Swiss-Prot record:
The lineage of its organism: Eukaryota, Viridiplantae, Streptophyta, Embryophyta, Tracheophyta. The keyword Ligase does not apply. Disulfide bonds join C22-C84. Keywords: Cell junction, Cell membrane, Disulfide bond, Glycoprotein, GPI-anchor, Lipoprotein, Membrane, Signal. Expressed in the shoot apical region and in young leaves but also detected in the laminar and vasculature of mature leaves. Residues 159-184 form a propeptide. Residues 1-19 form the signal peptide. Residues 113-139 have a biased composition (Low complexity). Contains two additional disulfide bonds. PANTHER family: BETA-1,3 GLUCANASE, PLASMODESMATA CALLOSE-BINDING PROTEIN 3. A lipid is attached at S158 (GPI-anchor amidated serine). It comes from Arabidopsis thaliana. InterPro entries: X8, X8_dom_prot. The keyword Glycoprotein applies. This is PLASMODESMATA CALLOSE-BINDING PROTEIN 3.
Amino acid sequence: MAVFVLVMILLAMAGHSSGTWCVCKEGLSEAMLQKTLDYACGAGADCGPIHQTGPCFNPNTVKSHCSYAVNSFFQKKGQSLGTCDFAGTATFSASDPSYTTCPFPASASGSGTTTPVTTTPSTRVPTTTNTRPYTITPSTGGGLGIPSGINPDYTDPSFGFKLQSPRFGFIVLFTLFLPFYLFS
């Protein structure tokens, strides 16, 4: 009995690192990713680290820079619903996309506080054309045919239905079942 209580206390106190990141989707054209990158940087993402002298410049690919920018925007907006959609070009990731020299923020406090860059963006000629309308606006939606921002292709199928901190789950279980063991 005492061992069970001790194990439950240790499990409740055990730390657990969890996070949610926003990354650009695979298989999209560079033109679409560039539009998403430009929007995120212009809308307040901290894009300093992906500039040429920044720690996240390499790998110097549009997808890599796009993922950093949309994640920065998502974290700055407090991981709010609809801030990781970007007209379908971005999605949630439960695995940390950080790499050696480039830590991706996992919260608003780690996403920097720089103001949007006002320099003229480089011009790129798209190699493909997209015939459907394309706009990049984060949506909160939810009414009369307007999308709610809930992305149907999350990579983590339990995303909306899991506890963000397993510690809370252990505390609840411990609190619920402790009286049964103490008074039985």
